[in-house]
Amino acid sequence: MKNLAGLMKQASQMQAKMGEMQAKLETVEAEGSAGAGMVTVTLNGKGDLRRLHIDPKLADPAETEMLEDLIVAAHNDAKKKIETMAAEEMQKVTGGLNLPAGMKLPF
């Protein structure tokens, strides 16, 4: 019974740390770029788009398809960086315990 109480306490502490991590992820940002920096996007740790920069040279209507591709590529680049940051923070919180992404503790 003592082990169960210790496990419950540890799970509660881990849940609190995960809450702190979620709050921290709202404040961190990652920038992704494509086309040698002609398109850059900045996402917060939750994956929300915060900023988008498009080089004015890409404003040519004939380049619309390329511009769309570069925006998608820059967004995906930033998203990968955010996912890496989140995974690193999760490792710190869980002490290396590999939990599935998005797993909520039941305590």
From Swiss-Prot:
The keyword tRNA-binding does not apply. Keywords: Cytoplasm, DNA-binding. SUPFAM superfamilies: YbaB-like. GO terms for molecular function: DNA binding. Pfam families: YbaB_DNA_bd (PF02575). The keyword DNA-binding applies. GO terms for cellular component: bacterial nucleoid; cytosol. InterPro entries: YbaB-like_sf, YbaB/EbfC. It is found in: Cytoplasm, Nucleoid. Belongs to the YbaB/EbfC family. Homodimer. Binds to DNA and alters its conformation. May be involved in regulation of gene expression, nucleoid organization and DNA protection. This is Nucleoid-associated protein GbCGDNIH1_0260. It comes from Granulibacter bethesdensis (strain ATCC BAA-1260 / CGDNIH1). The lineage of its organism: Bacteria, Pseudomonadati, Pseudomonadota, Alphaproteobacteria, Acetobacterales.
